[in-house]
Amino acid sequence: VIAEGQQAPPPWLETLDGDAPILLIAPHGGYAEPETAALLAPRVNDLHTADITRELAIRLDAAALINTAMDRNRLDCNRLDEVVAHAPWLLTMIADRLEQMVAEHGRALVLAVHGWNLVEARVDIGVGLTKRAGRLVPSRGAHVSVSDQFLTGTLNVLIDRLGRAGIVSTFGLRYPAGGAQNLMQVFTQRHSASSIDALRRITALSGRGAIEAVQLELSIALRFPGSLRDAAIEALSEILANGGDGAMRNGNHSHRSHRTAGAPTIHLPRSAPRKSARFGLEFYDPALRIGAMASFDLGVGRGGGRFMILRTDGSVLLFTGERGSDRESAALRVGPLRLRTDGGRLRLEFVGPALLTPDAATYVNIERALSQSSLETEVTFTIDFTLGTSLDVESVRAGAEGEGASGIPVRFGNFSGRMRIGGRDHSMSGVARIGPAFTALDDAAFDARRRLWAFADTDAGAIQANEFFVDARWHPGSGSDRCRIIACEPPAIHASLTAIRDEDQTVVGQVVSHIPLVRSDSRGRRFRTSIGFADFAIERHRYFGMFETSWRVDNRPSTSDSEAETG
């Protein structure tokens, strides 16, 4: 990648000088090369982190090493093994700058700016720690990259300051920065016995207690241009000024240490969850031809929630968030997305940011989709569901935690509500399905799948079809309602509905909107998927609903722990 003996930094690395004892690094600020587009599941570059790092460097008067163009699929500047093999000069450059800072100031702060492709306004702080049972502990053999004083002082004050701006902070929730090859571990004693001179120089500074090193994983809401990004930069600039001196001016340091803090109050069920499932709500307005999907992860393990809105102009609106540690009675909440039982009905509410992508077809390549997207900072909706049979949040939660997806009943009905996107209000109504998330892959024990649901607001009721391709043939799944799918690909869907006494009826669906995806099941197997909404016709009846088709594709093996650690 880099010529041996090269003295000047390569064109893709922007270097900035500063007088403060701060070194900023943007390891993944580049973009995908044309060759990367041929990969089925390339690692996504951290869009906008180069610009954010540059702005922070100017405001903090900090030095900076900014990757502005190198594709992380060619050279991952956050992986020590790749840097040693292909860009060892980068470690020397880091060591030189840190030694100079420590000589002048007696200390240095290293701040690595990364991107987390979650939409919710969140930052995950990586210092080699993760939270277990309310306590911060080192993750999988990690060395902690900050001192106790910096952890309980500066970082606590930063978390409070971000919280006042509406930004949620966590320690190592997804990215603890504890992997052996993670760049943050360079600034600890983990590699003190290395034969590499630059590494020994850096660890010598660390051994003197002269370095504090922090990895910041900024969500989409904090990276894409908008008020939340401005608020995050303002908070970081204020608290981390002069290497963290801003915290002394802004904090009272009355916080309990995160290493010893007790667990937060959690209203647990009588018995701990045994299983998990994704609970989904899908709804479609046939007049506006707008379809939406929302879902919540329930039960064991970490999870989150999300919604996706598909429109006939080909655009898609997306929100994703992380599930918190607390739970609310008669409600499910993931950040600003909330589902609650209200007077015998289910009400879905949201006020917050969402990612707007003008062309849903770009989602076959996540980085391309993100590069064409913008942030809608204020999306709001309130949707009420009226079902044929009542359903409440607590019964759904209990079913998912006790039996998994099979413990969640399926209900069809109607919805009504209001939605505001981009300053435009929509009054909505139409058909809805509630139950196990229609599109969830879970542990996909099939090579392909095709399914549909359709509902008519008449006595005609609902139809469902669910088929799996196993052992070279299609097999009907449970809940297929005598409906067999013939073809399930945009722009049209064809199926056959077997009547009880009459001849088979033809089901024809015209696709209104859809999105192609590449996604993984719980075992890491890759699938290509097409999901969307359609208008259906069965003889004289009009139905409205959804379809999905997924098939397994080959993929290169994923790296072991690097994906979770390189950020």
Which positions does each model-derived feature cover?
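Structured soluble/peripheral alpha/beta segments that form catalytic or ligand/cofactor-binding pockets
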Residues: 253-567
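N-terminal catalytic or cofactor-binding beta/alpha core of small enzyme domains
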Residues: 1-251
